[in-house]
A protein has these predicted regions:
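Ribonuclease/tRNase effector modules and their secretory precursors
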Residues: 1-107
Length: 107
């Protein structure tokens, strides 16, 4: 049984901060927000570790969108909020467009 504090994985991002992904948060993402992401933990881990691009949210300067190409005109996006030096995975989804925002990093 997964406890609320069980860590699925933790990654270091190219921006120099870590993102621990907790089992309970991942469950919320795949149950309520984006069920299509079920079973794609490794893909999101890769997106956080090796994104093609990272953009900063226009609405919240502490939110970063990590993008990795999945196929032409299709990206995986991991949305991370950085608080007190560490990242928190807000959500993850597949998209056909990269959001407008300040580019922070490109591979």
């Amino acid at each position: 049984m997964m406890g609320a504090e069980e860590r699925l994985f933790e990654v270091s991002t190219p921006l120099g901060f870590t993102v621990p992904v907790m089992a309970e948060q991942w469950k919320k993402i795949v149950t309520f927000k984006h069920p299509i992401m079920s079973g794609r933990q490794r893909d999101i881990q890769e997106t956080l570790e090796n994104p093609g691009e990272i953009r900063r949210s226009r609405k919240d300067p502490n939110v970063y969108l990590f993008y990795r190409v999945e196929r032409p005109n299709r990206w995986l996006c991991a949305v991370v909020k950085r608080l007190e030096g560490e990242g928190f995975l807000v959500t993850a989804y597949v998209t056909d467009a990269i959001k407008i925002g300040e580019s922070e990093w490109r591979s």
